[in-house]
């Protein structure tokens, strides 16, 4: 089921990514362009010089770069290549579209309003990705604080987050636990590749995040790993994925 549709992306080959935000890409006509890379992390397992990539051309006087790197072709869990979404600015919009399409109605119940980037937490210095107001028919009338995490790192068919130490991610888990029990707290790993079958915390990359993740589950934070397929002109819903059984740290 397509959730986001857009003009077909252009394909190229990744030459290199550098200074975190920049990537040199050779287009099919041989032209080399510099594209914005919104993903500032290590991009473990999805950053492969020479790989096929897809990028969006959107020149504007307000933008320094006319190109944005959107997708990367990566080795899939079944040995076949698949496409991963690497633009970390996109998942919030994608998850909002998922909710509005009713894909999570069984888990969240009826929703009457969605607000983005709402201040909350300690001294209201954090911002929740999405704040959901339940509809009248929802049996649970608590507000829903929903945090989204783009997830592309894998171990076999298991999606893992994070792929590096993330103090920001640790803080988000603490803040989510802080809204309980007066509100619901939901963590949504946005599984931005179609070849994954379950989700687990990236203990190897960030043991403290893994420990806080377990604390959050015990405290009542809900985790809804949402899987998507990325194509050149659309992103489609692939369904929820379960949590993998994992040991306590």
From Swiss-Prot:
InterPro entries named in the record: SfsA, SfsA_C, SfsA_N
GO MF, one annotated term: DNA binding
One Pfam family per UniProt: SfsA_N
Cross-referenced NCBIfam families: sfsA
Similarity annotation: Belongs to the SfsA family.
HAMAP family: SfsA
Protein name: Sugar fermentation stimulation protein homolog
Species in which this protein is naturally found: Synechococcus sp. (strain CC9902)
């Amino acid at each position: 089921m397509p959730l986001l549709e857009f003009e077909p992306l252009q394909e190229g080959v990744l030459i290199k990514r550098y200074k975190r935000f920049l990537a040199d890409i050779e287009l099919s006509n041989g032209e080399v362009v510099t594209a914005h890379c919104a993903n500032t992390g290590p991009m473990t397992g999805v950053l492969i010089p020479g790989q096929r990539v897809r990028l969006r051309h959107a020149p504007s006087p307000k933008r320094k770069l006319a190109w944005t790197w959107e997708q990367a072709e990566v080795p899939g869990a079944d040995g076949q290549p698949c496409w991963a979404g690497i633009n970390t600015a996109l998942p919030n919009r994608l998850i909002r579209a998922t909710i509005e399409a009713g894909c999570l109605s069984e888990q969240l119940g009826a929703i009457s309003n969605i607000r983005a980037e709402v201040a909350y937490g300690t001294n209201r210095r954090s911002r929740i990705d999405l704040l959901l107001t339940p509809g009248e028919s929802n049996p649970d009338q608590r507000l829903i604080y929903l945090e989204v995490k783009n997830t592309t790192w894998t171990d076999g068919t298991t999606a893992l987050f994070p792929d590096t130490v993330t103090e920001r991610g640790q803080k988000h888990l603490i803040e989510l636990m802080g809204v309980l029990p007066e509100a619901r707290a939901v963590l949504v790993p946005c599984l931005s590749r179609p070849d994954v079958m379950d989700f687990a915390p990236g203990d190897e990359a960030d043991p403290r995040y893994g420990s806080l993740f377990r604390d959050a589950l015990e405290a009542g934070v809900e985790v809804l790993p949402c899987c998507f397929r990325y194509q050149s002109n659309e992103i489609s819903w692939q369904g929820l994925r379960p949590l993998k059984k994992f040991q306590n740290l």
